Each structure stands twice: as structure tokens, then as C-alpha cells.
A protein has these predicted regions:
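Terminal alpha-helical segments
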Residues: 1-140
């Protein structure tokens, strides 16, 4: 995939989050899908990283290589901590069945926004103009 295709996937993940949140809120009683909200935020962050990697002719095929690249690339070091926190929260949701309250969702959104803002700036500097600055906030 090229960077623009990855960025369309980010938008798709946001659209999926919106659909999920709307469907869950429409249930009686409302369904708690906070686990998937965190997971989708992590997936969007991951796809932003993959888009940047592709713009630099790198093909990251798994989370291990992605983390290794984040931890060893000078202009990405600023986002290693928020990215890792998002990944851990997503892992807790997927493998431990954790659900999250509003404060925890807000923290996850904050981490996501740090990653997104940094990567969108780098993508634009690399000439990728289709970098959407998606915000999951309205769907949390």
C-alpha cells in the first residue's frame, strides 16, 4: 500500500468507530464498547505510522518491527511513549476484556492526538498531502 491508501484506512477506522459508537448508544441499555473505542484509536495510530514508513520506503509488516522503528528513528522518539500507552490500553481491552471510563478514554484520545499530530506533520513534510487529522473525540 502507498501512504495515501494507508491514510484512507485511517479514515475508514474513524468511520467504523462512529458507526460502532452510534449503534452501541442506540441499544437499551447502551452497550459498553469502550474496549473497541481504545482498540480503534490504537489501530489508527498504527496506520499513521505505517503511512509514514511507506513514505520513507519502509514496509512495516508487524508490531515488533513497527515498535523497533519507532524506538530507533530520531524524529519519532517523541511519540514512542504515547504510542506504547495506546498499544497497552488496546492490548488490555482485547486480551483482558477491560472496559474504560470517560477519563481513561480521554487519556487514550490524548495519546492518540499526540501521535497523530506528530505524524501528520512529518507526512506533510514528506509531501503526503492527503494526511487527515482525524479526531475520535466526538465518538468517545
Amino acid at each position: 500500500m502507498n501512504p495515501e491508501q494507508y491514510l484512507r484506512l485511517v479514515q475508514h477506522d474513524l468511520d467504523t468507530l462512529a458507526l460502532l459508537a452510534k449503534a452501541a448508544a442506540g441499544r437499551t441499555p447502551p452497550e459498553d464498547v469502550s474496549d473497541w473505542k481504545c482498540t480503534l484509536m490504537f489501530y489508527m495510530a498504527c496506520v499513521y505510522v505505517k503511512a509514514l514508513a511507506r513514505s520513507r520506503q519502509k514496509d512495516l509488516q508487524d508490531h515488533y518491527n513497527l515498535r523497533q522503528w519507532l524506538n530507533t528513528t530520531k524524529d519519532l522518539l517523541a511519540i514512542t511513549k504515547p504510542y506504547r500507552r495506546l498499544e497497552e490500553r488496546s492490548r488490555d481491552a482485547r486480551y483482558e476484556g477491560r472496559r474504560f471510563g470517560g477519563q481513561e478514554l480521554g487519556e487514550a484520545r490524548s495519546w492518540f492526538l499526540q501521535v497523530r499530530d506528530h505524524l501528520v506533520q512529518l507526512l506533510e513534510a514528506a509531501g503526503v498531502r492527503a494526511a487527515p487529522g482525524v479526531d475520535p473525540g466526538p465518538h468517545l
